Amino acid sequence: YAFDKLKTKDDVNHFFKEVFPDFYEMMPEIGDTWEDYPLAGLVIIRCFPWSFGKVSLIGDSAHATVPFYGQGMNSGFEDCRIMNELMIEHNEDWEKIFKAFETLRKPDGDGLQDLSLYNYYVMRDYVADPEFLLQKKFELRISKLYPEKYLPLYSQVSFSNIRYSVAYAKGMEQDAFIKEIMANHDIRSMFESEKVDDLIHEIFSDREAYDLVSN
């Protein structure tokens, strides 16, 4: 099955009846809804500069992204907060405010877009992968034992004030580090034998807490 194979309402109804029968029972009008709301493309906007004279882009107009991290509205709210802070800092000198704003937020707009695309590939290719799920379990255990030394990428993005650009860079660094550990140790058997904590203490007890710069 693929979206491009669903040409008619009957195709849609047949697909959901066969593949998702429980869903079809709850929403038997899915064929009509499919026709009323056709598929549309998703876009990312990357541009710079964001300001000209007394006008500045903000939110989606500056850094629209795909929805795979659920952070689009939040990033817009962050823009508003930072713009307000800059208004106070620069005493409403709009030329200075806009220049400072776009310089500060452009890397984070790009960072959110990189995160969103990365999470799309994760959801598409890895959420049912046993090794990926084991890695997430391992990361959560590390974070529980050493929260000041290891914060999973999703937590950095969704439950902190860490800049998107910093979270993305740190997340990729952490991913490579954890993959290296897992390549050299049988993490699955360590969980089963309850020895995984010993390995975590061995690796992380002497590591310095990392500095994650917030907005």
State each model region's role:
Residues 69-86:
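A short alpha/beta connector and helix-capping loop motif
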Residues 58-60, 78:
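Active-site flanking residues adjacent to catalytic metal/cofactor-binding acidic residues
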Residues 12, 16, 79, 105-108:
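Hydrophobic/aromatic residues within well-ordered alpha-helical segments
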Residues 40-57, 110, 132:
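FAD-binding beta-loop-beta segment adjacent to the flavin cofactor pocket
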Residues 1-43, 90-92:
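Conserved FAD/dinucleotide-binding core of flavoprotein oxidoreductases
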Residues 41-46, 62-74, 107, 120:
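Glycine-rich phosphate/pyrophosphate-binding beta-alpha loops
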